[in-house]
C-alpha cells in the first residue's frame, strides 16, 4: 500500500490545497484544441464515464481509442461491446499506450494501483496521464514517473448526464486540477482545460481545483448527503409510512419518486425554492424538523469529515478491498433485503404538488443534509464552490437514480468507493434517527398538513434565514453558468 499523499503535507500545505477552487472565466476556453487536436488519446476502461466522455471528445473532433484488458476483448465483455458498438478502435494497453499522447484512466478506484503501474511502464516519455477522480493519487499515494504530467478532469455527475447535456449543446460543471508533483513541463492546466472543453464542461462552469480538494470534498458529499442520507432517509421514511398504515405501493412511490421531484427544485432555486414550494404552515414545520435533524446528525457528519481528512476512512476501505470487499458485500445485502427494496413495483400516480404536501419530512431531510454537509466542509477548509457541488448540486442527479430502480440503481451507478461510504453512514445514522422518527406528527409524512394561523414575524425570520445561508449565496453565483440546464418531467 502506498503512503497517503495528503498526510505527507504540512498543515499549511493542506490548507492551501483544500482551499484551491477558482471558477475559470468562459473566455479562457477555446474549441480549437491547440494542444489535443490531432493527438493520440487513449481511454483506459469503458464504463459509464469512460464511454460518455469518449463520445463527447470524439464529437468535439478529437482522436479517441480505448484500451481494455486482453480478457475483456477475447471474452467480448460489456466494456468491449460498448466501445465496439460505438465504432471506437479497441486494443490492449500493450498495443495502444506506447503511442498515446494522453492516457485517461477511467477504471474503478480499487483497480488503479495495478492499472497505473501497467500504464507507467508503457507510456512514452513526456506523455500525460489523466484521471476523473484523485483517490489513487491522494489516498493511496501512488508515485508517477516524473516526466509524466498528471491531470484531472472531474465532471460533477454520472457519465450518462455528461453525454446527455453535451447532446443538448450544454455540459455539466467540472473540476480540473494538475498534480503539483507531476507538472514538469507546465502544460497540465492547459491540457485539462482542453479536455474539459471537449466533454462540454466549459458551458456549465469549470473550477480550477486541486487533487486534494476534489477527493476530500467528493468523499464527504457522497458519504453524507448525496448517498448516505438519501439511503438512510429512504428506508426510514418507507418504514414510517408502513407503520402508519399506508399501502406499500403508495409508500414506495412517495419515497422512490419523491426525492427526484423535490430535489428538482434545487437545480433552479436552491433550498429557497424548495421551501417556497411548501405552504406557510408546512414551511414552518419543515424548518423546525430540519433544525432538529441538523442537531442529531451533526456528530456523524463531523466524524465522517474527520475520518476523511485523516485518511482513516480510506485506510479501512482499502483494507476491505484486500479482503474481497467482505464488509461492503455484507452491507450491500442488508440494504437489498430492506422492505423498501423488496416492495413490488408501484403503478400509483402522484401529482407533483402531492410530493411536497405529503413529503414534508423529506424536504426537511434534504435541507438538513445539504446545509450540514456544506457547513462542515467549509469548517474543514474546503472552498464554498467545492462544497456546493458536493452537497447541493449533485443531489438531484443521485435522486434520479433512486427514482429509476431505488437504492439498487443508486448503488449500481455510484462507485464502490461511494457505496462503501454510504453504507458506513447508514450504519450510524439509521439507529440514531429512530427516536426522532417516533416524534413525528400527522402531516409530517404521508398526509397533507392542515393550514394554521401564521405568525408573520416567525415566517419572515425563517425565509430570511434560509435565503441568507452561504450555500444559497454561492448557489446563485454558480447557477448562472447553468441557465440552460434541462428540467426533468419526473412525476
Swiss-Prot record:
Pfam families in the cross-refs: KARI_C, KARI_N
Pathway(s) annotated for this protein in UniProt: Amino-acid biosynthesis; L-isoleucine biosynthesis; L-isoleucine from 2-oxobutanoate: step 2/4; Amino-acid biosynthesis; L-valine biosynthesis; L-valine from pyruvate: step 2/4
Presence of keyword NADP: yes
Residues bound to NADP(+): 46-49, 69, 77, 79, 109-111, 159
Gene: ilvC
Protein name: Ketol-acid reductoisomerase (NADP(+))
Residues noted as binding Mg(2+) 1 in the record, renumbered to the chain: 218, 222
Active site positions, chain numbering: 133
Native organism: Buchnera aphidicola subsp. Baizongia pistaciae (strain Bp)
UniProt record similarity statement: Belongs to the ketol-acid reductoisomerase family.
Annotated cofactor note: Binds 2 magnesium ions per subunit.
Amino acid at each position: 500500500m502506498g503512503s497517503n499523499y495528503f498526510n505527507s503535507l504540512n498543515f499549511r500545505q493542506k490548507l492551501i490545497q483544500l482551499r484551491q477552487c477558482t471558477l475559470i472565466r468562459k473566455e479562457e476556453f477555446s474549441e480549437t484544441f491547440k494542444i489535443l487536436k490531432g493527438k493520440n488519446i487513449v481511454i483506459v476502461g469503458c464504463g459509464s464515464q469512460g464511454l460518455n466522455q469518449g463520445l463527447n471528445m470524439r464529437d468535439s473532433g478529437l482522436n479517441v481509442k480505448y484500451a481494455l484488458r486482453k480478457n475483456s476483448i477475447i471474452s467480448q465483455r460489456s466494456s468491449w461491446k460498448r466501445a465496439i458498438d460505438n465504432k471506437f478502435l479497441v486494443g490492449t494497453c500493450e498495443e495502444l499506450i506506447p503511442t498515446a499522447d494522453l492516457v485517461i484512466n477511467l477504471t474503478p478506484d480499487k483497480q488503479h494501483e495495478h492499472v497505473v503501474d501497467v500504464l507507467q511502464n508503457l507510456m512514452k516519455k513526456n506523455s500525460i496521464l489523466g484521471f476523473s477522480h484523485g483517490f489513487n493519487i491522494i489516498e493511496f499515494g501512488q508515485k508517477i514517473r516524473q516526466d509524466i504530467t498528471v491531470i484531472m478532469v472531474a465532471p460533477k455527475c454520472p457519465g450518462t448526464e455528461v453525454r446527455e447535456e453535451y447532446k443538448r449543446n450544454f455540459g455539466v460543471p467540472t473540476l480540473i486540477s494538475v498534480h503539483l508533483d507531476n507538472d514538469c513541463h507546465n502544460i497540465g492546466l492547459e491540457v485539462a482545460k482542453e479536455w474539459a472543453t471537449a466533454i462540454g464542461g466549459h458551458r456549465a462552469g469549470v473550477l480550477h481545483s486541486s487533487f486534494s480538494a476534489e477527493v476530500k470534498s467528493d468523499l464527504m458529499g457522497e458519504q453524507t448527503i448525496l448517498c448516505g442520507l438519501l439511503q438512510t432517509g429512504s428506508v426510514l421514511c418507507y418504514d414510517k409510512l408502513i407503520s402508519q398504515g399506508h399501502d406499500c405501493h403508495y409508500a414506495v412511490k412517495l419515497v422512490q419518486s419523491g426525492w427526484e421531484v423535490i430535489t428538482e427544485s434545487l437545480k433552479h432555486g436552491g433550498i429557497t425554492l424548495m421551501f417556497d414550494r411548501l405552504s406557510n404552515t408546512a414551511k414552518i414545520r419543515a424548518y423546525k424538523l430540519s433544525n432538529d435533524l441538523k442537531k442529531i446528525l451533526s456528530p456523524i457528519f463531523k466524524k465522517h469529515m474527520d475520518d476523511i481528512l485523516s485518511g482513516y476512512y480510506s485506510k479501512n476501505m482499502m483494507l476491505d478491498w484486500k479482503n474481497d470487499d467482505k464488509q461492503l458485500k455484507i452491507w450491500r445485502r442488508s440494504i437489498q433485503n430492506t422492505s423498501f427494496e423488496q416492495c413490488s413495483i408501484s403503478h400509483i400516480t402522484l401529482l407533483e404538488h402531492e410530493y411536497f404536501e405529503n413529503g414534508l419530512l423529506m424536504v426537511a431531510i434534504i435541507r438538513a443534509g445539504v446545509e450540514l454537509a456544506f457547513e462542515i466542509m467549509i469548517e474543514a477548509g474546503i472552498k464554498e464552490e467545492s462544497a456546493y457541488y458536493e452537497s447541493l448540486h449533485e443531489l438531484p442527479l443521485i435522486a434520479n437514480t433512486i427514482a429509476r430502480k431505488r437504492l439498487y440503481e443508486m448503488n449500481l451507478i455510484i462507485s464502490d468507493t461511494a457505496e462503501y461510504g454510504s453504507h458506513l453512514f447508514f450504519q450510524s445514522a439509521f439507529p440514531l434517527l429512530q427516536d426522532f422518527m417516533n416524534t413525528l406528527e400527522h402531516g409530517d409524512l404521508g398526509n397533507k398538513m392542515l393550514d394554521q394561523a401564521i405568525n408573520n414575524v416567525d415566517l419572515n425570520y425563517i425565509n430570511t434565514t434560509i435565503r441568507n445561508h452561504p450555500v444559497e449565496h454561492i448557489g446563485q453565483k454558480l447557477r448562472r453558468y447553468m441557465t440552460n440546464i434541462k428540467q426533468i418531467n419526473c412525476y
